[in-house]
Amino acid sequence: MKKIKSIEEIINDYDNFIIDQWGVMHDGTFGYEHAVNSINILNSNNKNLFIISNSSKRSKSSIDRLPKLGFKKNSFINTVTSGEMIWQLLKKEFLDDKNKKNCFHIYDEEKEDGLDFRDGLNFNFVEKVEEADLILACTPFVKLQPIDYIPLLEVAYNKEITMYC
């Protein structure tokens, strides 16, 4: 593998750049200065930039937070997140109102986009896992530790509830 010290060493070798978010562009709170600078250099050289991420967020949510991290929203052609892919799958798979499913949604209530993830999905969202036909796990409940999920997961296992994560 070739190590580079600056994006300028390879900028003329490619037209398109796929960039991961977490740990490459930012740490969740601050954008890395070298990443901001590199993206600005790529933009000034008319390169096509794409973000790819295993984030549970939808693509729009990821794009909307870029300015807070020091990046320009319009620097990127597209953003693909695992959260967006799951949302698209659920949207397509559960269109039928006749067989509307009960969904137990796990999300961090303190995040800006927890409830927004539900928009456009055709489910009855329920408060108890016992009532669910499926579980949508986006981000952990902020006040729970991993061990606190055991009772919930036992119910899901015993009822053979499908979980999307």
Predicted features along the sequence, with ranges:
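HAD-like aspartate-dependent phosphatase fold
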Residues: M1-C165
